């Protein structure tokens, strides 16, 4: 079966509208999990206010800002940064794992029970979390160097969670296979990832202009919208990999 962008777009659109309720629920659940973890972090409010009130133009301005901090502020900033990274990874892994399990549950001819699917999710979660950490770290290094390497790494590593789920491979094998397949089919996978990135940028720009809306409400709308957008990308990539395995 030939793999085309139009075919994947049609299948993604069909699945999204067929399971829109479940996707919304998962997106909202991941957002509230994010909020719940944020409540437990309880950071130093002085550090949070400093981070929110300072606009860092580039890495050098951030480094200069950190150098001017005292030792206690540096310690609090490091702790806050680590906790925020963990919060983001847990939320992303929950969303990613839930959508993958949902697509798998719907796609399988022999239906699993909901209990079995939940069990699969919890077994899959630890390895997916570590994979997310590794791929996020690699992609961020790419973005620190230049924009293009970051985008390219985002594309070629995008299949790794789905390969990990299907093949039950080791983490590095999933990354290696993702790089090989994604590079080979970059003209098909690339548009999906770029659509997601552009969508994130447009949403961020649009929501930044709603200054009259309460900050917490805006955060909620932003997170749910971003999660739905990411879910669409996962559906697109999952469908690609299903067709790829059959071809």
Curated annotation (Swiss-Prot):
Membrane-crossing residue ranges in chain numbering: 20-40, 85-105, 114-134, 137-157, 188-208, 218-238
Pfam families attached to this UniProt entry: UPF0259
Membrane topology classification: Multi-pass membrane protein
Location(s) in or outside the cell: Cell membrane
Gene Ontology cellular component terms for the protein in this record: plasma membrane
Xref: InterPro entries: UPF0259
Record has Transmembrane as a keyword: yes
Main localization, broad class: membrane
Alphabetical UniProt keywords: Cell membrane, Membrane, Transmembrane, Transmembrane helix
Record has Kinase as a keyword: no
Stretches assigned to coiled coil: none
Family according to the record: Belongs to the UPF0259 family.
UniProt protein name: UPF0259 membrane protein BUAPTUC7_273
Organism: Buchnera aphidicola subsp. Acyrthosiphon pisum (strain Tuc7)
């Amino acid at each position: 079966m030939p793999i085309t962008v139009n075919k994947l777009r049609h299948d993604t659109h069909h699945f999204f509208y067929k399971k829109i309720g479940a996707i919304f629920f998962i997106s909202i659940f991941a957002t509230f999990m994010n909020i719940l973890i944020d409540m437990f972090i309880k950071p130093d409010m002085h550090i949070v206010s400093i981070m929110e009130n300072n606009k860092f133009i580039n890495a050098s301005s951030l480094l200069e800002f950190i150098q001017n901090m005292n030792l206690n502020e540096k310690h609090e900033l490091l702790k806050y940064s680590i906790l925020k990274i963990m919060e983001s990874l847990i939320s992303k892994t929950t969303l990613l794992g839930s959508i993958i399990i949902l697509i798998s549950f719907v796609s399988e001819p022999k239906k699993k029970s909901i209990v079995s699917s939940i069990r699969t999710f919890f077994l899959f979660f630890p390895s997916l979390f570590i994979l997310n950490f590794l791929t996020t770290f690699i992609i961020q290094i790419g973005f620190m160097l230049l924009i293009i390497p970051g985008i390219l790494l985002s594309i070629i590593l995008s299949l790794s969670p789905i390969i990990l789920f299907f093949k039950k491979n080791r983490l590095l094998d999933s990354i290696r296979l993702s790089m090989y397949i994604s590079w080979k089919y970059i003209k098909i996978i690339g548009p999906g990832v770029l659509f997601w990135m552009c969508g994130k940028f447009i949403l961020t720009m649009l929501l930044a202009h709603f200054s009259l809306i309460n900050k917490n409400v805006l955060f909620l709308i932003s997170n749910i919208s971003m999660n739905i957008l990411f879910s669409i990308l996962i559906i697109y990539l999952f469908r690609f990999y299903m067709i790829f395995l059959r071809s």
